[in-house]
Amino acid sequence: MAIRTFRPYTPGTRTRVVTDFNELTGRKPERSLVVSKHRLKGRNNRGVITCRHRGGGHKRLYRIVDFRRNKHDVPAKVAAIHYDPHRNARLALLFYSDGEKRYILAPAGIAIGQEVISGPKVPIETGNAMPLSAIPLGSSVHCVELYAGRGGQMVRSAGASAQVMAKEGDYVALRLPSTEVRLIRRECYATLGEVGNSEIRNTSLGKAGRRRWLGRRPQVRGSVMNPCDHPHGGGEGRAPVGRAGPVTPWGKPALGLKTRKRNKPSNRFVLRKRRRVSKRSRGGRDS
């Protein structure tokens, strides 16, 4: 997989960088694995906006992805690599030997015709799913379960992977993409390898319209609003915030405030906290 750049024929193509989609082998999704989905557009059950800057975008069909990998000891072959509009990773369509079809997250390097399998005693190969207790130290994994049988909940984004660091008792230590080291039960399943489509981090949408196609509406800075709309608003010209630090539209501290509870029960499973990301490297906007 590679990325594609464009000549500056228009302002929208000047900075546009996209993946070339050459790894995709099927244009239409498997009909038995798609369902219609009503998009909430950032609203809750009362119609109140709970997540700003969401709405519009192209119509989508939701692909049913197998995060549990609970079809043990039944081999499957990779039939196709498909696009998924709901995530930045690709999907691998599996044809099981008993005739069932399922989607899984496509690992990096997986090929058409490759055989994958899940179970407690399966070969150590990319795409195979097994308990953390059976995975060698130093291996890269993705789609990691946080609770046994619930399905993969962590490390599912494109290019992401976690590393098996140590095993002790009933727990396995994983180094997550955030650099946090966390203990997870040894019976939890994970898939070997890293998630594919890692070049997505080097892409650029190029224009505002392409962002609208994805269902993202404009983000207006608080400093250009009126005082009745945002704590940063008002003043003559480019006025400063007027507070000790930036705040959200509801007056809560923004950009750097820790929101995790100090006495959260799961803190005992965190061996090393994640690295703090500076404001400059985060590239955040005025709230």
Swiss-Prot record:
Q: Name one Pfam family in it.
A: Ribosomal_L2_C
Region (Disordered) residue spans: 221-287
Q: What's a single GO MF annotation on this record?
A: transferase activity
Q: Which SUPFAM superfamilies match?
A: Nucleic acid-binding proteins, Translation proteins SH3-like domain
- Name the GO cellular-component terms: large ribosomal subunit
Signal sequence span is none
GO-annotated biological processes: translation
Basic residues bias spans = 258-287
**InterPro entries on file:** NA-bd_OB-fold (IPR012340), Rib_uL2_dom2 (IPR014722), Ribosomal_uL2 (IPR002171), Ribosomal_uL2_bac/org-type (IPR005880), Ribosomal_uL2_C (IPR022669), Ribosomal_uL2_CS (IPR022671), Ribosomal_uL2_dom3 (IPR014726), Ribosomal_uL2_RNA-bd_dom (IPR022666)
Q: Which UniProt keywords apply?
A: Ribonucleoprotein, Ribosomal protein, RNA-binding, rRNA-binding
What is the recorded function of this protein according to its Swiss-Prot or TrEMBL entry?
A: One of the primary rRNA binding proteins. Required for association of the 30S and 50S subunits to form the 70S ribosome, for tRNA binding and peptide bond formation. It has been suggested to have peptidyltransferase activity; this is somewhat controversial. Makes several contacts with the 16S rRNA in the 70S ribosome.
- Could you say which protein family the record assigns here? Belongs to the universal ribosomal protein uL2 family.
Subunit annotation: Part of the 50S ribosomal subunit. Forms a bridge to the 30S subunit in the 70S ribosome.
Stated name of the protein: Large ribosomal subunit protein uL2
What is the name of the gene encoding this protein?
rplB
